[in-house]
Regions:
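Extracytoplasmic ligand-binding site segments that recognize negatively charged/polar headgroups
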Residues: 81-213, 218-227, 244
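Mature extracytoplasmic/periplasmic domains
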Residues: 276-337
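A ligand-binding cleft/hinge motif common to bilobed small-molecule-binding domains
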Residues: 83-86, 233-254
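A bilobed periplasmic-binding-protein/Venus flytrap-type ligand-binding module shared by bacterial periplasmic
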Residues: 136-141, 186-187, 269-281, 300
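Short beta-strand->loop
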Residues: 94-105, 155, 251-267, 276-278
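Early extracytoplasmic/lumenal segment of secretory-pathway proteins
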Residues: 23-87
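Conserved C-terminal helix/tail region of periplasmic/extracytoplasmic solute-binding proteins
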Residues: 224, 332-363
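Periplasmic-binding protein-like
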Residues: 200-209, 215, 253-274
Length: 363
């Protein structure tokens, strides 16, 4: 789901080399670049003898197209929860059949329930990573301009008295109408998936007030801009924000980039593992999914990219600064304020896209 630095490696295809044999077992993965731990892939291959071919995509739309067209040749794909919902609706994925997954019990029931808003019964998708949409903030730049800035509130974006004082140092938003509009509706006290014209009109007005203060709307670019100090606030995804923060720290920048989950609540997103309906090697696919449900397999990824995982038994294997960060693993009170994705009809999606296009054109 998330579009960040790894997308620049989208042309990469990695085939882990093993000798070709007559009855060779093969697994074809389709994922973002660098979105599986290298050690985990090597362990899987060594343990099972299955040769792994790892192809990458650089946008969710590319993956959607592959799934909807069919005959992709892939065995495991990694759609965001919104993409999984569309694939389920189009009958483009097959049931995972968790009866064959002995490690599925490691998954957090509360998170499974949130994913079930688009995959009832969790039949078609297995949570891989998860996170939130929130505020990436250059703390020093913001507090210099607004000493009493509400760093944990979307007021920072949506109230002109704050956003207007930050325009000179840069505000950006992810280019994702469904997600941003849902977050805006929730901020206004409406249902995040309201289709009422009056509610969408309020969102239109809210975004119109923000528009003069927005530097750009794009996904991915903000990571480097946060790291080098070219932005002071971005509405973005957990991992993207924390990647920018880590880059700034590693470069010894004279400022701190932080991530905050808005106190008003926000969207929880998932990247999932799913099996295309016509996957050529479905049993190998299930073997891989079960392998990634082992705590050590997914902990490697979380420690590297700062994306939370849904594996309860992986927590003891996480770095303390990751597991203890309330903006990566929020406490129970905040988790209650997180809303899952919901599939809208094509007309409802078009209504939101038109609203967003008008806002984006003016920005």
């Amino acid at each position: 789901m998330r579009v960040f630095f790894r997308a620049t490696l989208a042309a990469l295809t990695v085939a882990l080399a093993v000798p070709l044999q007559a009855q060779e077992r093969v697994l074809n993965l389709y994922n973002w670049a660098d979105y599986v731990g290298a050690d985990a892939l090597q362990r899987f291959q060594k343990e099972t003898g299955i040769r792994v071919k790892y192809d990458t995509f650089d946008s969710a739309e590319v993956l959607d197209s592959k799934l909807m067209t069919g005959r992709s040749g892939y065995d495991v794909v990694f759609p965001a929860s919104s993409g999984l919902a569309r694939a389920i609706q189009a009958k483009a994925v097959q049931p995972v059949d968790d009866g064959q997954l002995k490690n599925v019990a490691n998954l957090d029931p509360e998170l499974l329930a949130k994913l079930a808003t688009i995959d009832p019964g969790n039949r078609f998708g297995v949570p891989y990573t998860w996170g939130t949409v929130g505020l990436a903030i250059n703390k020093d730049a913001v507090l210099k301009r607004i000493p009493d800035a509400p760093l944990d509130s979307l007021d920072l974006l949506f109230k002109p008295e704050y956003a207007g004082r930050l325009a000179d140092c840069g505000i950006s938003l992810i280019d994702s109408p469904q997600e941003v509009i849902s977050v805006a509706l929730n901020y206004l006290g409406k249902s995040p998936y309201s289709t009422e014209p009056a509610d969408l009109a309020q969102v239109r007005e809210l975004l119109a007030k923000l528009q003069p203060n927005v530097r750009y709307i794009a996904s991915g670019k903000h990571i480097n801009d946060l790291a080098n100090g070219s932005l002071c606030v971005a509405l973005t995804y957990t991992g993207d924000a924390l990647m920018g923060a880590a880059q700034a720290k590693q470069a010894n920048k004279p400022f701190e980039v932080i991530y905050r989950i808005p106190k008003e609540g926000t969207l929880i997103w998932f990247d999932t593992m799913a099996i295309p309906v016509d996957a050529p090697h479905p049993q190998e696919a299930r073997a891989f999914i079960d392998f990634m449900l082992r705590p050590e397999s997914i902990a490697e990824l979380t420690n590297t990219l700062y994306f939370a995982n849904a594996n309860q038994k992986a927590t003891p294997l996480l770095n303390a600064d990751v597991a203890g960060d309330p903006d990566i693993y929020p406490p129970a009170a905040m988790r209650q304020k997180l809303f899952g994705e919901q599939l809208l009809t094509l007309k409802q999606q078009r209504d939101r896209t038109r609203l967003w296009s008008a806002f984006r054109t003016r920005s």
